[in-house]
From Swiss-Prot:
SUPFAM superfamilies: alpha/beta knot (SSF75217). It is found in: Cytoplasm. Coiled coil: none annotated. GO terms for molecular function: rRNA (pseudouridine-N3-)-methyltransferase activity. Pfam families: SPOUT_MTase (PF02590). Its main location: cytoplasm. This is Ribosomal RNA large subunit methyltransferase H.
């Protein structure tokens, strides 16, 4: 089974966001084992990623992708990274330069979101990507 780690700063405080995140996590459960870790700060994210081979960081300077391009990108990352993939969401101060230099940078939008909203958008796009790759009706 494919394993996805989502690392981010701070926990989700709003129940409705957590419920929505959990719904997508439940939908993905058949294909993906998702582990979420909440860091105190961005430097803890750096510590947690020291031994990771393939890291994707969400960053405003990263490459913007359509949902279809994200699905293709996501699929290629699995091929490159094996059965484990790590996606990192920084806090308000952004990500440490050292982490950004050793990662693939993508952006979900030109807009700025809280890290809590970003987690929800990210997991929905991951779900959408899996559905695009299966050619399901979800994306149509």
């Amino acid at each position: 089974m494919l394993k996805l780690r989502i690392l981010s700063v701070g926990k989700t405080k709003e129940k409705w966001l957590e419920d929505a995140f959990n719904e997508y996590q439940k939908r993905l459960k058949a294909n993906l084992q998702i582990e979420c870790l909440w860091a105190k700060d961005s430097y803890q994210l750096l510590e947690w990623t020291q031994k990771e081979s393939l890291i994707i960081c969400l960053d405003p300077t990263g490459r913007l992708l359509t949902s279809e391009a994200f699905a293709t990108f996501f699929s290629k990352c699995w091929e490159q990274g094996g059965s484990r993939l790590t996606i990192v969401i920084g806090g308000a101060e952004g990500l440490p330069l050292e982490l950004k230099q050793h990662s693939i940078l993508i952006s979900l939008s030109l807009l700025t979101f809280t890290h809590q909203i970003t987690r929800l958008i990210l997991i929905e796009q991951i779900y959408r990507a899996t559905e695009i790759l299966k050619n399901s009706q979800y994306h149509k």
